[in-house]
Curated annotation (Swiss-Prot):
It holds the Pfam family Amidohydro_1. The keyword rRNA-binding does not apply. It comes from the Bacteria. Zn(2+) binds at H66, H68, H236, D311. This is Imidazolonepropionase.
Length: 402
């Protein structure tokens, strides 16, 4: 027996059920990293050493399903320039923008990338996160994309957390392929994806499908290559315009479409006819001072599951706090606190391809939990800057975050 929790008020977050589903104080028996038994009256073996939650709320461990937390360099100077009204095109021409992060990341060693990522990861863990998705996309060469993915996977060796890695080589056009985007897509499909699959460095492949990124046709090529190598797909779609990338991703069985500020009703209907999750990224919306909001009412009307994530990255969402994103989901996108908690638990698990073992509290599920010093779950999206986390449990192992 690995762990026993007693007097735990559970917020089970089972999908498809209304409300927080708060239970009376329960006992949880955890064995081999999974929840084996839940009940009010369970006979414990004589050698058990139960941990009393003393009536504290216990939720599923939070899941940050979209991050770029492995990178080198800073974009703080770019932030200042943007506030002064300098256009992004001018910043990029002066060596700034995403390619400045690419240059810094290429120069950094795998070990340096790990050290730089750990403080960002620590911020997420302090907000109750137990699972994190990490994308590549700042290398844009075979060598550097592999380096980023290896660094991301290595984070599990330094912190008690579950890392899911995603290949995002189709994030931007590297300088070496300027004016030859189709050639770069061919390089991704023929060289990068096969190597990533062979070394099992990622479970999914993402594409920035946008007017300043890659076309729908190019995105489809990458998706076909990914699926041919047994990898899942997902898309950065409809952030700046409505190209139809979300509908493509849904039609091809993608895990999630992310950003989606410009998603139209036809795109929402395409999501509703699939199992693809709509991932909202309020941090980027806020940081870029956008005004076009995701179509929340349509997503509700057509019952499309919504996830929320930090989109932690140096250029458009430098935030390492998932509770802040929950608050922004409420204040900027008019979600309810219940919707935001669902968005970082069961729906986020679905967005990563883990709907059957993460994101809710139920027998047989992974023992990834967060124990909170709060009276009601709405407090998680209500107050920002004061940690209410008592402890995390990852694979049945207790961890206290300072």
């Amino acid at each position: 027996m690995n762990c026993v929790l007693t007097e735990a008020r559970l917020v089970t977050m089972q999908p498809g059920v209304q409300g927080y589903q708060i239970t009376e104080p329960q006992t949880l028996i955890i064995e081999q990293g999974r929840i084996q038994h839940i009940g009010q009256h369970i006979d414990l073996p004589s050698d058990a050493h139960p941990i009393s939650c003393a009536g504290k709320l216990v939720t599923p461990g939070l899941i940050d399903c979209h991050t770029h937390l492995v990178y080198a360099g800073s974009r703080a100077n770019e932030f200042e320039l943007r506030l002064q009204g300098v256009p992004y095109q001018t910043i990029a021409a002066q060596g700034g923008g995403i390619l400045s992060t690419v240059n810094a990341t290429r120069k950094a060693s795998e070990e340096a990338l790990i050290e730089l990522a750990l403080p960002r990861l620590d911020g997420l863990l302090r907000s109750g996160v137990t699972s994190v998705e990490v994308k590549s996309g700042y290398g844009l060469t075979l060598k550097d994309e592999l380096k980023m993915l290896r660094a991301a996977k290595a984070l599990e060796q330094h912190r008690r957390v579950k890392i899911t890695t995603t290949l995002l080589a189709a994030h931007a056009l590297p300088p070496e392929f300027q004016g030859r985007s189709d050639d770069y897509i061919a390089h991704i499909c023929q060289e990068i994806i096969p190597r990533v699959a062979e070394e099992q460095l990622a479970t999914s492949v993402d594409v920035f499908c946008e007017s300043i990124g890659f076309s729908v046709a190019q995105t489809e090529r990458v998706f076909h290559a990914a699926q041919a190598h047994g990898l899942q797909i997902k898309g950065h779609t409809e952030q700046l315009s409505n190209l139809g990338g979300s509908a493509l991703t849904a039609r091809m069985g993608g895990l999630s479409v992310d950003h989606i500020e410009y998603l139209d009703e036809a795109g929402v209907k395409a999501l509703a006819q699939s199992s693809t999750v709509a991932t909202l990224l309020p941090g980027a919306f806020y940081f870029l001072r956008e005004t076009q909001k995701p179509p929340i009412e349509w997503l509700r009307q057509y019952r499309v599951p919504m996830a929320i994530s930090t989109d932690l990255n140096p250029g458009t969402s430098p935030f390492a706090d998932l509770s802040l994103m929950m608050n922004m989901g409420c204040t900027l996108f008019d979600l309810t606190p219940e919707e935001t908690l669902r968005a970082v638990t069961c729906h986020a698990a679905q967005a990563l391809g883990y709907p059957a073992n993460r994101g809710q509290i139920a027998e047989g599920y992974d023992a990834d939990l967060a124990i909170w010093n709060i009276e009601h779950p709405a407090e998680l999206s209500y107050q920002v800057g004061v940690s209410r986390l008592h402890a995390r449990i990852v694979n049945g192992e207790l961890s206290y975050e300072s």
